Amino acid sequence: MIQNIIFDMGGVIVDVHREEAIRQFKAIGVADADLLIHASNHRGLFLAFENGDIDSETFRRQLSAHAGKDIPMDDVVKAWKSMISQPPLNKLDFLLELRTTYKLYLLSNNNPILIEWARTSDFSEAGLPITHYFDKLYISYEMKCTKPGRLIFEKMIQDSGINPSETLFIEDGEHNIATAKELGFYLYHAVNGEDWRDAITAILR
């Protein structure tokens, strides 16, 4: 019986606009942005940022060095924010409904710039931060590891005390789904932009 639900953020809770982010990063001087930015698992400097190996200012400095020009932090923040959009209120309301019955967790490969935004009232049209919708957030840069590696899942399982056999994992990344399957989670493979409410309701019946 399912008692817990884990959601990914990008591509599940919020839509991911990879092509727009690539365009924005190229506009500020990152010519190979298309090689570094991926829908679920970034590469190079972008992966190091999500893995917690570097902080926001170090990312800005290293990105500037990579681009061969100084990139202001405001431009970095704007480029990152172009990757996602505010989540639809109907999804957020659905999360609140689920929380009356299930424990809800977020497991996300993410960086300080986007999570600091998500933890403010700007996250939703309702003026509520992402923390309002989940029992706990598990964020890659804070945990110093990223999906699809097993370690981030194992750390989450140990900290939360959940049993994978009682937990539904909702994710858009194919490789991340594969790791969760190995660990025994119930799975729903979401598609970026999808309204998955009916599908999740059917699974939970």
Which sequence ranges carry the predicted segments?
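Asp-based, Mg2+/Mn2+-dependent phosphohydrolase catalytic module
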Residues: M1-Q3, N111-P112, E116-R205
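Hydrophobic beta-strand scaffold residues
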Residues: L104-L106, L187
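N-terminal helical cap/lid subdomain that shapes the substrate entry/recognition surface
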Residues: I2-L89, T100, N111-L114
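Alpha-helical transmembrane segments and their immediate juxtamembrane flanks
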Residues: K91-L95, S108-N109, I115-E116
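Alpha-helical elements of Rossmann-like donor-binding domains used by nucleotide-donor carbohydrate transfer enzymes
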Residues: E20-R23, G44, T58, Q62, ...
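Alpha-helical packing segments of well-folded alpha/beta enzyme cores
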Residues: P87, K91-F94, M156, N176
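Catalytic-core regions built around general acid/base machinery
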Residues: N90-T101, Y133
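Generic structural signal for small/hydrophobic residues in well-ordered secondary structure
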Residues: D8-G11, G52, L98, L106, ...
